[in-house]
Amino acid sequence: MDFGSLETVVANSAFIAARGSFDGSSTPSSRDKKYLAKLRLPPLSKCEGLRDSISLEFDNLCSEQPIGKRLFQQFLKTDERHVPALELWKDIEDYDTADDDLRPQKAQAILAEYLDPQGTLFCNFLDQGMVARVKEGPTGSQDGLFQPLLQATLEHLSQGPFQEYLGSLYFLRFLQWKWLEAQPIGEDWFLDFRVLGKGGFGEVSACQMKATGKMYACKKLNKKRLKKRKGYQGAIVEKRILAKVHSRFIVSLAYAFETKTDLCLVMTIMNGGDVRYHIYNVDEENPGFPEPRAIYYTAQIISGLEHLHQRRIVYRDLKPENVLLDNDGNIRISDLGLAVELKEGQNKTKGYAGTPGFMAPELLRGEEYDFSVDYFALGVTLYEMIAARGPFRARGEKVENKELKQRIISEPVKYPEKFSQASKDFCEQLLEKDPEKRLGFRDGTCDALRANVLFKDISWRQLEAGMLIPPFIPDSRTVYAKNIQDVGAFSTVKGVVFDKADTEFFQEFASGNCSIPWQEEMIETGFFGDLNVWRPDGQMPDDMKGITVEEAAPTAKSGMCLIS
């Protein structure tokens, strides 16, 4: 075994040990006591001023923010007047994610318990006309069956109950968490593991948050390389989009900070590797995927693209190596450095961006384009997943970009026998040369794609709720990445000097914690439950008063929590 191979074996062993069962988020022994001690709720004297600086908008505070939602629901549970609305809210959410065979029974239970005046939790705040329409309508497994009721319930809760919440101890507890969330964070909070890959401006490595033990991927953008190659705009756009979009089909940004040499984006770690690696490297004798596996990934990519396009974001770099698998075998799209956000009133953009072989004809011709370019790239990606080669060149064929451009613009695509008629037809609709005729995002949704016969066996509701079992589940003992020596190294960048404007850009970039992923981390790793301790008499907890109590180090399954 040469030194390079030995280095990979050692690095892989350390990485696998750190991530534990797979995500490394529930191993108390992996937590650093020094940083663990810093995760403590502050006294109210330090955080009450946040009341004037945070958004007090109901949806953001009580629905979108995970800790905010939990605390608001805990508050509602303490007042019997609000319990019917709380339980209806929770039961409708449960109905929306339930298996189809369970939904009729759950629907009947909702009708009997909350809409019948004789029900134990009758919701008298609901408009009786709306209730009558729901009762008269079809019951069973219909999507959106109870959405009018849910909207009315949240509207009710956003009035009097919300105002009561803002004056409660539960809201003060929320302010404590927001103070903790806002504390500075930097590279010293993270432990680096092996390099997973390389991008245009730096490496991506596995890392572990020292306080919680949660594993992440850290994308390091070399400052000098960014400046020399004029990469500031792409870096800040990627960071802003990742922080803005929260989707189970797009990698999430948890932290952003700077080091002496790099700008760092700490994101969802995708332990299953990228789709390109699986196409060509997992089974080299039989590259490519069976069609059902390719269809499953395509469906998840469609949902991710829809979430981007609904926020007016053109991705521009969809390809197999930017589609990553998580622990369970579900995918997320990543690397949004080439994405562009359309301004209000702007329907198209212009500019040469993307990867040769994946760029749409209108983009290659220098024309204005819209979201449709991403669906052309989806067609190329689906084709490659099935055929183990691109649609415009043979596997291993070296083609000059000029020739490749000509093929994309004018030549028809040929399909090998591996394609069923349905997958061929779907690909052809995506690889349509005319963007006006191309299948894609229409009227704010991807429903036209979902309706295609290719997805007849996909339950889109369950897919988007994360309830389907993927066709391939990664092995927790395997590192799905190239050997370290095959990743390659960057050459040293010389002759770059930073000025005041550079420093200001770096400081703007290093914004610290991202609210929703940070709160999810606190919940998933058990810290929310461990620190959210209340007195049995309902009086103000000691931590709010600033009274320190000697506590044991929290664990993911601690019994300290009274309400979680």
Curated annotation (Swiss-Prot):
Domain AGC-kinase C-terminal: 456-521
Positions of the propeptide segment: 562-564
Main location: membrane
UniProt entry keywords in alphabetical sequence: ATP-binding, Cell projection, Kinase, Lipoprotein, Membrane, Methylation, Nucleotide-binding, Phosphoprotein, Prenylation, Sensory transduction, Serine/threonine-protein kinase, Transferase, Vision
All residue ranges annotated as the Protein kinase domain in the record: 190-455
Provenance organism: Rattus norvegicus
Xref: SUPFAM superfamilies: Protein kinase-like (PK-like) (SSF56112), Regulator of G-protein signaling, RGS (SSF48097)
Localization per record: Membrane; Cell projection, Cilium, Photoreceptor outer segment
Phosphoserine PTM positions: S5, S21, S491
Summary of subunit composition and partner proteins: Interacts (via N-terminus) with RCVRN (via C-terminus); the interaction is Ca(2+)-dependent. Interacts (when prenylated) with PDE6D; this promotes release from membranes. May form a complex composed of RHO, GRK1 and RCVRN in a Ca(2+)-dependent manner; RCVRN prevents the interaction between GRK1 and RHO.
Catalysed reaction equations from the record: L-threonyl-[rhodopsin] + ATP = O-phospho-L-threonyl-[rhodopsin] + ADP + H(+); L-seryl-[rhodopsin] + ATP = O-phospho-L-seryl-[rhodopsin] + ADP + H(+)
Record Pfam families: Pkinase (PF00069), RGS (PF00615)
Keyword Nucleotide-binding annotated: yes
Protein family membership: Belongs to the protein kinase superfamily. AGC Ser/Thr protein kinase family. GPRK subfamily.
Protein name, entry field: Rhodopsin kinase GRK1
Residue ranges of the region described as Interaction with RCVRN: 1-15
